[in-house]
Amino acid sequence: VVQVLSGIAYDCDVLVIGGGIVGLSTAYAITRAAPGTRVVVLEKEAGPARHQTGRNSGVIHSGIYYRPGSLKARYAVRGAAEMVKFCAEYGIAHAVTGKLIVATERDELPRLHGLVQRGRENGIPVRELGAAQIAEYEPEVEGLAAIHVGTTGVCDFVGVARQLAEASGAEIRYGAEVRRIDRRPELGVAVLTGAGDVVRARVLVNCAGLHCDEISRMTGDDPEMRIVPFRGEYYTLARPELVRGLVYPVPDPAFPFLGVHLTRGIDGGVHIGPNAVPALAREGYDWGVVRPRELGATLAWPGSWQIARRHWRYGAGELRRSLSRGAFTTAVRRLLPAVTADDLVPAAAGVRAQAVLRDGTLVDDFLIKEGARAVHVLNAPSPAATASLPIGREVARRALESLRSV
């Protein structure tokens, strides 16, 4: 690969690695902001959005959960409105349904009130509900109190990703797995794919999701974090008439996970989940998928052991709910008392790419870093699909700035 750059025959100006919604939004934003910029996207799968983008709850998040001023708060609030507009413009299935966040225990009430305050600070309209008012929205849901967030919705994020790919005008190469990267700050970047192709670019953008830290290291940039994969398991509700819209528990602030929730998707089906259990591979969609090299790398990262030490109790509960449908049902019943284990039909799982620092800190905000001729998106789990248009613009801005400076 090293020899190839000496001739400086670039295949593109910007090379994006990763054909999920963030990578495709970045390609779309680059060609919008700087028409004529040549963009190539490399995606190892046979089509777009095969991992985090296509394996989530399909929720357009309002932004209520996130710290005011954080990238998650700013980009989710802006991104939710833009996502609805984008879906409407291109005829992509979506609905603004609103959602309930329900407190089922007394100790959750102060946290619920905290979400009301946070919603107001983030400019999100919120309605507070007493126990009796919950039935106005969800007759089968029980709780001590709740809040209704009107701007939450659902959409087809895979459809959005496909549309971004088409509208970007970028050259998308599927089945192109990155094997090696050779970066020369004075020349550019050459990437070798599994098929033996070499792609030369002036600037590289890393939107590799579950593999973003590996791509960063291949480029020669220490990401100073590791992706620790957490699987989220889902069920489909056999009696969808029990749930009208979206119902969430009050999240535990110690974790960047929102808890098991009920989601009526655009297909009319109701999905229940996800939990959060350590995956034994980066693409470990069930317990049978084990990749010793990836698992070894996770276990070798000091942050993984810090998480285990701090949160073993929470982890043990999640593990129990993963291995026992009865335990999972008990958790769901706190919100939806009428549900039984027979109502839960196993559905496709997702894996969340969670960035973890060396000291065990779970990175709470989106994380974008830069190196010579490179921009790396190193933490973009939920609500990144909702926020993908603003994230894409920010990554594009940095990539174009890098392009202008070379």
Question: Where do the language-model regions lie?
Answer:
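Beta1/beta-strand and adjacent pyrophosphate-binding region of the FAD-binding site
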Residues: G7-V22, V40
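Helix-loop-beta segment of a Rossmann-like dinucleotide-binding subdomain
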Residues: A9, A93-A103, L115, E128, ...
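Flavin-dependent oxidoreductases
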Residues: S25, I181-V290
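Glycine-rich FAD pyrophosphate-binding loop
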Residues: T31-R55
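Dinucleotide-binding Rossmann-like beta1-alpha1 core, especially the glycine-rich loop
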Residues: G58-Q133, G143, G259-H261, H271, ...
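Short beta-strand to alpha-helix junction loop
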Residues: R67-R78, V102-R111, I147-E166, R173, ...
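Flavin (FAD/FMN) cofactor-binding core of flavoprotein oxidoreductases
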Residues: A132-A135, R226-R231, T236-A238, I307-A380
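Helical element adjacent to the flavin cofactor pocket in flavoenzyme catalytic cores
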Residues: I147-V203, C207, H211-E214, A387-L400
